[in-house]
Structure formats: C-alpha cells, structure tokens
C-alpha cells in the first residue's frame, strides 16, 4: 500500500512532547516523540479492513473461505455470537433452532435515470446500503484486501449485491464506490477514524464524497450520525468536524483521521485505492492546524484532478461493464504519482440528514 504524509505536529493544545521528524522506509513521514516505542506500537496494527481483528477490544473474525460459508467458519461465528451477545447462547439456539424464520427480502440495486440529480442518487445508494443492515455477528462475510487492484474490489462489490448479506463499514465503502462509478462528477475518497473510549481504541471508515464543491459521506455504522452525510458541507474540515461531534455524543474521543486520495471511476482500473494519503494526529496537531491540514488535503485532491492525474470525467465508452451496477463511461486516467502527499482544515458543523436508528446494543461504533 503506498505511503502518505503523516502529520502529527505541535499545535496549540497544551504541553506537547518534544519531537523530531524522521522518514520511515515506506515514505511515511513519522514523528519520533518522547513516547517513542509506545506511539509507534499504536501505529502498527492500524488496518481498517480488519480493525486489527478487534472491535473496541472485542475480537472479530473474517470469513476467508468465500461463499457459501464453510462449516468451520459457520460454527465459529455462532460460538462468537453466543459469547458477545447479552443473551449469550440463548439467542444463538433460538435462531438456529427456529423452523419458521421469515424470508428476508433482497434489496434492489438502485438504478437511475440520466436526469436524476446526484444528491438524490446518493440518498438512494445510502438507502440500499442501509437496507443490507449492519453485521452484528462478529464475523465479516467478505474478505477485503486493501492492496487489491480496484477491478478486483469492484468484482467483490458486485458479489455483495448478489448475496445481500449484512455488512460492516469497510464493505460499505467498497460498495459505495461500486454504486457511484456511474457518477463522474462525484469525487470519492476514503476517510478513516480512530477513536478512544473506555480503555479501548475503535476504528471506522466512510466514503467521503464531493459534489459541486460540497462534501458528504456514504457508509455503514451502528449509529446513524456516523455514516451518511448529504453533500451539504462547504469544506472537508466541516465534514470531518461533524463526524467528530457525532463521536462526542457517544463519548468517543477522536484520535486520528486518515484521508485517502480520489478513487478512479474506472471499474476496470488495476491501480490500488490510496487509503492513507494524509494521516492526522488530532491531539498533537491542535485545532487550528488540524483544520488547516484537512483543507490542505482537499486542495491536494483538487490539484490532482486539475492536473489530470486523478479521476475526472470519463472519456471512453465501454460496451460491457461487468463491475458496475449500470453501464457508464469509465475513466482511463491513471494517477502518475503516489508520492505527492500532503494532508489538509476549517470549522463549522452542519445538521446531518436523519437516518433510521441502527439501535445497536453496544456502544461500539
């Protein structure tokens, strides 16, 4: 996975440890602090795809055997459900022993008329993601390797629409990319969050979007204000700070934000998604610098698209699009440089659009 620029600078928040910048072999700019090894140890397991195989201190599993789920994975899932659910084994036995479980309807993949406005399309995409429901089992059904080329991830997203199984946040990001490939005027980029609550770290990811200069997000969460945001935020910093406020309402403290680069609209692209172009340490940066770095990242994305190295409007027709829900034009542009990395900030909060409550029984997000 390509490295990005990590920003963990001083800022204005109280006493900050003395630090000196050092360049890691991967090209990620690291800051060595007096906390030294503990700070670096905290960095190593940060992989949103599997959340370090822990979700707020609670282990969770990934189905690596594909579908249909093999018996060993199936039994492990139910054993884990019995362990983490408040009703323990009773709930697993009640579901597995039932003979009259209702048939779950399969949501329809959204389709659009050419005249349908992009904001309405985004609402439909989010509604579809929401209808798949959040996966509370503790076993992620689709294995997502973030280093896979985009074309492989789009094939996986297509499989998600066929299976219509509950998903977690990273799966929702891949699905969101797939379902918006036919919207060339919509910029898409990953936004990852690391928060702290009650002695544990939690990780979450959404798909940031930018349409007509307004920012929003698509995603999946146990909490309605940590996924969908309509494209109504004037700046990237407003969007991120709105997520931070949502975290604050469930007593989570935002620790880090990772911002990726714009994702190509070409479902057949062999390039990888750039997940961590900017890594921002919220505490060390301080409020003003945090906003500045967020806005710098937004400028980087605009400049990259302006230079023709990002995903602009598609220019080439494809007769058959096997990895997109609709037949659409696809972008042949490839990003030329993965080493041009800088992060981006500004503040204001906007009312998020109300979504149905996911009503999780845990405070994990």
From Swiss-Prot:
Catalytic activity, reaction form: C-terminal L-alpha-aminoacyl-L-glutamyl-L-glutamyl-L-tyrosyl-[tubulin] + H2O = C-terminal L-alpha-aminoacyl-L-glutamyl-L-glutamyl-[tubulin] + L-tyrosine
Cell compartment(s), UniProt: Cytoplasm; Secreted
Biased composition range(s): Basic and acidic residues: 337-351
Impact noted for substituting residue 76 to A: Disappearance of 36, 32 and 27 kDa processed forms
Subunit structure: Interacts with SVBP; interaction enhances VASH1 tyrosine carboxypeptidase activity.
Variant or mutagenesis effect after changing residue 169 to A/S: Abolished tyrosine carboxypeptidase activity on alpha-tubulin
Keywords: Carboxypeptidase, Cell cycle, Cytoplasm, Growth arrest, Hydrolase, Protease, Secreted, Ubl conjugation
Reported effect, residue 256 to E: No effect on tyrosine carboxypeptidase activity on alpha-tubulin. Reduced tyrosine carboxypeptidase activity on alpha-tubulin
Effect of residue 77 to R: No effect on tyrosine carboxypeptidase activity on alpha-tubulin. Reduced tyrosine carboxypeptidase activity on alpha-tubulin. Abolished tyrosine carboxypeptidase activity on alpha-tubulin
Organism listed in the record: Homo sapiens
GO MF term set: actin binding; metallocarboxypeptidase activity; tubulin-tyrosine carboxypeptidase
Annotated function: Tyrosine carboxypeptidase that removes the C-terminal tyrosine residue of alpha-tubulin, thereby regulating microtubule dynamics and function. Critical for spindle function and accurate chromosome segregation during mitosis since microtubule detyronisation regulates mitotic spindle length and postioning. Acts as an angiogenesis inhibitor: inhibits migration, proliferation and network formation by endothelial cells as well as angiogenesis. This inhibitory effect is selective to endothelial cells as it does not affect the migration of smooth muscle cells or fibroblasts.
Major site of localization recorded for this protein: cytoplasm
Keyword Cell cycle assigned: yes
Protein name, per record: Tubulinyl-Tyr carboxypeptidase 1
Active-site residues from the entry: 169, 204, 221
Coiled-coil blocks: none
Acidic residues bias (residue ranges): 43-53
Effect annotated for changing residue 222 to A/E: Abolished tyrosine carboxypeptidase activity on alpha-tubulin. Abolished tyrosine carboxypeptidase activity on alpha-tubulin
Tissues in which the UniProt entry reports expression: Preferentially expressed in endothelial cells. Highly expressed in fetal organs. Expressed in brain and placenta, and at lower level in heart and kidney. Highly detected in microvessels endothelial cells of atherosclerotic lesions.
Gly residues bias: start-end ranges: 1-13
Pfam families tied to this protein: Vasohibin
